Amino acid sequence: MELEFPEDLRYLDSHEYIRLDGEIATIGISAYAIEQLGDLVFLELPEVGDSLERGSSFGSIESVKAAEDLYPPVSGTVIDRNEAMIETPEVIADDPYGDGWLLKVRVENPDDELEDTLSAHDYRAMLEGEEGI
């Protein structure tokens, strides 16, 4: 199956993505991460109002194969979390870049936050180098 990496997103090497719209960031996990994890069974996310710091774990996702920490690509305050994904994490795989988003965050410094992220092209190249996808 050909994995999708939308061009309008930025990616982390830890496989989270970000869609930045002004000062609001939508955060989720990439189709590649979902494929590697397999069937998702548990998702832990911060509460609305919690602060996130780029590079510090904000939650975790578990599958039948593994458990992984989640890392925010930006610093800011959680303004929404996808309750449907917490209740039924297995459906994240159905639409990871649309309905499968995890958090919405009000970003502190939108102009500076994307500095260490990857374009879709660079993310795919990283994966091809590591995994030969």
UniProtKB/Swiss-Prot annotation:
Pfam families: GCV_H. SUPFAM superfamilies: Single hybrid motif (SSF51230). The keyword Cell membrane does not apply. Binds 1 lipoyl cofactor covalently. Residues 24-106 form the Lipoyl-binding domain. The glycine cleavage system is composed of four proteins: P, T, L and H. This is Glycine cleavage system H protein. It comes from Crocosphaera subtropica (strain ATCC 51142 / BH68). The gene is gcvH.
